[in-house]
């Protein structure tokens, strides 16, 4: 059965579609509500020809902030993430997610300090807090940083989320939004089991996000569920109806080119469950330790974001 409108247009009727890219042209093409960036996407964007002016501007700005070479690199990296965010905000009507340096993932106070710095840079450019999400890894320390930032009126996007324990702790901390990963969970199970083909509705990443979504709605948590890290459009279509989905330009293109009917799979139920006592740090760490997939994928995600952050800083160092 086909529909006269594209799958992307149909999906937008039931889910807020977010662009998972730093590429302005791709964002302009697909007209998402919001956009998300991360160190890997920023590295990619900073290599694009049309961003070289921004790269130079960030380096020039960093030189005015400090005489210390190491500090200049850090400042330039923060500035480029904000400058790219500002360009994206000219196109999207909603929010930009900008990530805190992954090397701070186990340091609550340093994460809060970095978040304040990023927010101040956006504010100085005339952007109010309600258009920004600060991205933090869903470590215990990242979740605690988000808890404090939310109390200050700074909304957070908790990323690298692979487990129910992480999702529960984020909601209990009052996080504005979580980004539970789908494709990376599938990657782990494929490697672990040697099984290569999963029907979309049996995809372990899809199952994980579905259970988190249903739990949040049942418990009456306001934290937004934004599925992330997709490997194919089958995963996306199985999560139609999720609060938000952040999708790469390549997969948005596939959805835009298909007119097959999109069926809403997730629907918010009435909140009927009594809230449980909040997870303690000990319970959180124990549950994470019991989940090898989440433990390995969280650690790997932090390492990989750090690798790309360092590559970006190397590019900037060469210009300083």
Curated annotation (Swiss-Prot):
Its EC number is 2.2.1.2. GO terms for molecular function: transaldolase activity. It is found in: Cytoplasm. The keyword Transferase applies. Pathway: Carbohydrate degradation; pentose phosphate pathway; D-glyceraldehyde 3-phosphate and beta-D-fructose 6-phosphate from D-ribose 5-phosphate and D-xylulose 5-phosphate (non-oxidative stage): step 2/3. It catalyses: D-sedoheptulose 7-phosphate + D-glyceraldehyde 3-phosphate = D-erythrose 4-phosphate + beta-D-fructose 6-phosphate. It holds the Pfam family TAL_FSA. The active site is at residue 135. The keyword Transmembrane does not apply. GO terms for biological process: carbohydrate metabolic process; pentose-phosphate shunt. GO terms for cellular component: cytosol. Keywords: Cytoplasm, Pentose shunt, Schiff base, Transferase. PANTHER family: TRANSALDOLASE (PTHR10683:SF18). Belongs to the transaldolase family. Type 1 subfamily. Transaldolase is important for the balance of metabolites in the pentose-phosphate pathway. Homodimer. This is Transaldolase. It comes from Colwellia psychrerythraea (strain 34H / ATCC BAA-681). The gene is tal.
């Amino acid at each position: 059965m086909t529909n006269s409108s594209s799958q992307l247009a149909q999906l937008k009727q039931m889910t807020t579609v977010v662009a998972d890219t730093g590429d302005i042209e791709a964002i302009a093409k697909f007209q998402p509500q919001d956009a998300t960036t991360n160190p890997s996407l920023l590295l990619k964007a900073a290599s694009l020809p049309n961003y070289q002016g921004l790269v130079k501007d960030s380096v020039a700005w960093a030189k005015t902030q400090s005489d210390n070479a190491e500090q200049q690199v850090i400042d330039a990296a923060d500035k480029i993430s904000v400058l790219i965010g500002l360009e994206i905000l000219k196109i999207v009507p909603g929010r930009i997610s900008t990530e805190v340096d992954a090397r701070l993932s186990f340091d609550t106070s340093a994460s809060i300090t970095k978040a304040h710095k990023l927010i101040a840079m956006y504010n100085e450019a005339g952007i109010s807090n309600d258009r920004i999400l600060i991205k933090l890894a869903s470590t215990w320390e990242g979740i605690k940083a988000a808890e404090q930032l939310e109390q200050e009126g700074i909304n957070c996007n908790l990323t690298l989320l692979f487990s129910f324990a992480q999702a529960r702790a984020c909601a209990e901390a009052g996080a504005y939004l979580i980004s539970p990963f789908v494709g990376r969970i599938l990657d782990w199970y494929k490697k672990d089991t040697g099984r290569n083909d999963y029907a979309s509705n049996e995809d372990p990443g899809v199952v994980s996000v579905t259970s988190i979504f249903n739990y949040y709605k049942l418990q009456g948590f306001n934290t937004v569920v934004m599925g992330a890290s997709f490997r194919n459009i089958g995963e996306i279509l199985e999560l139609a109806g999720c609060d938000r989905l952040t999708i790469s330009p390549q997969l948005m293109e596939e959805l835009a080119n298909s007119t097959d009917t999109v069926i809403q799979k997730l629907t918010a139920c009435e909140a009927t469950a009594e809230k449980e006592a909040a997870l303690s740090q000990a319970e959180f760490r124990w549950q994470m330790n019991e989940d090898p997939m989440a433990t390995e994928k969280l650690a790997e995600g932090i390492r990989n974001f750090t690798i790309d952050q360092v590559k970006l800083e190397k590019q900037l160092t060469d210009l300083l």
